[in-house]
Amino acid sequence: FTILEQPGVDGFEVEQIEGFPIARGFEDTCGRFIEQFINDRANYRTVLEKPKFLIYNGKLNDMNPLMPILEKVANASAPKEQGGIGFSENLIIVAHHFSENVLATLANNFVQPGTIKAIPLKAPITSQANSHYHFLVDLSHFVGAKVFDPLSAPLESATLGHLGLDSMQSFEYMRYRSTIIGKPDEMLVLARAEELYKQKAVAESILDAELTAER
């Protein structure tokens, strides 16, 4: 977790904020489009407030599956006089892989004023079997978002309610790492921790047990 100081009546109040570190950054994800995703050039990073999360257990090779949910986010985050509902315009799209076409489209939209800010993030991979999927499930329990996949839960079925908790405060995108700051649902986190303890107990190798313990 991270400790943040916020102004209070008497000096500062210290608040415990849960943090989720990710061993991936824009260097691993964005390729030649890195510069278009940077919004804090002084620190060479991207910071998005009140992020939402679209989590996909698969590769994104074209924009078509993304368009329905992107349109929903765009409409919901529009000014109230245009029918918006105050929804966040900041969306983190997490998947196994992004094609050049998808990266180019997201990058071009990111720099356009008045558009939603959707950025890609490749799921980290380790030597553990199905590590992409394990990470996505871990992440989903922290941010409160649904994991989509090509067969049982296609992206076209995504709704605003599938994009995570309102208590996620920020997403920091660095060169080789990322961090989510926010308050998860304690019951979701505890449920996932219990699952991981069970996985560790039946791990087929010492390495697998160690990697599960790390998570």
Where are these regions (language model features)?
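Long, structured protein-protein interaction/assembly regions in large complexes
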Residues: 1-215
